[in-house]
């Protein structure tokens, strides 16, 4: 998104595949392409940009981050730019006082908390390929794994067949052998695997026992992450307000399963979400670094 010093949104652009850890150089190219498109659509020059905030997944990939900074330097906007994690961007938006708990579940997962003294605590967030459970990618991967483990009943068991048909359609393959070849030939299957989560959640809600078992296992582990975070923060209140971010945690059924898994540790749990996207938060943070005073309220006022 692009907005002016009054908080008026002047341009929006959407694309996918900007995770620096997953897509690396391709992500950098995409980000630059998006910036060039926005500049072109607004009929401005890069020198007209007062501040640029990028809230990105995978910023721990230092090589890709450095490559992106070099591109910003080439475009002569590096001194006006700030790169931060998408989780930090979401936290700044959803926990504006600098205190609270954020559970972000999309393709990946991370639980972030800060106490009244500003001390940070983090659970999970190691990466989609490093054991983080309960995320969109994990849900998709578990569904595919169950197909391979139950090949002898794929066409007999109705629940398994429903998932099998979905996977074949999503990946445009005829059988598991073709799917395996696709995984061997293509490096970046993360987005496609994570996209399965939406279907698995839908099937689980409609009483597909296989899908339900995946969601219940995933949310049970996420509940353990949340409890671990609360313990580390020494939070003893049985009532909690947790900020949520990401497509998976915004799913009502996923959140119901997570609430069920947390009911003995948090008896009264409230979720809060933002009506505006986290891209605004990244831009606001960048603006503040350039001493430009734009607030979330300014953005919301002009959206409404």
Identify the function of each model-found stretch.
Residues 22, 26-27, 57-66:
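N-terminal short leaders/motifs
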């Amino acid at each position: 998104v692009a907005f002016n010093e009054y908080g008026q949104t002047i341009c929006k652009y959407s694309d996918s595949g900007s995770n620096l850890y997953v897509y690396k150089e391709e992500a950098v190219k995409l980000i630059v392409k998006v910036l060039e498109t926005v500049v072109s659509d607004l009929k401005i020059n890069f020198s007209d940009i007062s501040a640029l905030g990028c809230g990105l997944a995978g910023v721990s990939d230092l090589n890709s981050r450095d490559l992106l900074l070099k591109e910003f330097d080439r475009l002569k906007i590096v001194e006006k730019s700030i790169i931060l994690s998408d989780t930090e961007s979401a936290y700044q938006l959803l926990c504006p006082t600098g205190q609270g708990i954020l559970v972000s579940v999309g393709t990946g997962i991370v639980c972030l908390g800060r106490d009244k003294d500003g001390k940070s605590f983090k659970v999970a967030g190691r990466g989609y390929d490093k054991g983080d459970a309960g995320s969109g990618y994990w849900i998709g991967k578990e569904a595919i794994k169950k197909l391979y483990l139950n090949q002898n009943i794929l066409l007999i068991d109705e629940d398994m067949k429903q998932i099998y048909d979905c996977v074949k359609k999503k990946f445009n393959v005829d059988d598991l052998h073709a799917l395996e070849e696709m995984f061997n030939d293509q490096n970046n299957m993360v987005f496609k695997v994570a996209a399965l989560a939406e279907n698995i959640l839908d099937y689980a809600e409609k009483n597909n026992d296989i899908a339900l078992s995946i969601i219940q296992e995933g949310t049970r582990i996420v509940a353990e992450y949340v409890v671990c975070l609360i313990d580390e923060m020494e939070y003893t209140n049985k009532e909690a307000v947790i900020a949520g971010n990401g497509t998976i945690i915004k799913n009502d059924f996923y959140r119901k399963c997570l609430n069920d898994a947390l009911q003995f540790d948090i008896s009264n749990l409230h979720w809060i979400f933002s009506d505006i996207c986290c891209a605004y938060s990244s831009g606001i943070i960048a603006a503040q670094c350039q001493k430009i005073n734009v607030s979330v309220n300014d953005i919301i006022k002009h959206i409404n």
